[in-house]
């Protein structure tokens, strides 16, 4: 299982990569593995400003739908349009082409309070 060191993580299995005043959000390798084959990603919150921990969308797999939680407060700028035609990108490349949203964090420094790779690995391994 992959735990990139340059990302921050949540207990709900989302990752965030801050690049200046923009951040990318996705689900972790562990999450996609546990979910199974992703068939649909729904991000109805583009253009909205949400608080950390709020639901920003859902991921649908063959037998269930899972909520997606925002790691930091901020505005959802765009969703990954490639997932409309190819939702399996989340399974194939969760930290790269399978990113879910691009956002503008209200306070990007708040990412420092999230889990680093080692702390997230401890969550996954129980």
Curated annotation (Swiss-Prot):
The keyword Ribonucleoprotein does not apply. Keywords: Lipoyl. SUPFAM superfamilies: Single hybrid motif (SSF51230). Residues 22-104 form the Lipoyl-binding domain. This is Glycine cleavage system H protein. HAMAP family: GcvH. GO terms for biological process: glycine decarboxylation via glycine cleavage system. It comes from Bacteroides thetaiotaomicron (strain ATCC 29148 / DSM 2079 / JCM 5827 / CCUG 10774 / NCTC 10582 / VPI-5482 / E50). CDD domains: GCS_H. Belongs to the GcvH family. The modification N6-lipoyllysine is found at residue 63. The glycine cleavage system catalyzes the degradation of glycine. The H protein shuttles the methylamine group of glycine from the P protein to the T protein. Its cofactor is (R)-lipoate. The glycine cleavage system is composed of four proteins: P, T, L and H. Binds 1 lipoyl cofactor covalently.
């Amino acid at each position: 299982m992959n735990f990139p060191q340059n990302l921050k993580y949540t207990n709900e299995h989302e990752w965030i990569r801050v690049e200046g005043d923009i951040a990318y959000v996705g689900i972790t390798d562990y999450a996609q593995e546990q979910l199974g084959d992703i068939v649909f990603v729904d991000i109805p919150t583009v253009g909205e400003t949400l608080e950390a921990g709020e639901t920003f969308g859902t991921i649908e797999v063959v037998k269930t739908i899972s909520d997606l939680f925002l790691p930091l407060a901020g505005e959802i700028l765009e969703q990954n349009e490639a997932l409309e035609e190819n939702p399996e990108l989340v399974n194939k490349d969760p930290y790269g082409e399978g990113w879910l949203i691009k956002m503008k964090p209200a306070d990007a420094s708040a990412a420092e309070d999230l889990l680093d790779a080692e702390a997230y690995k401890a969550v996954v391994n129980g």
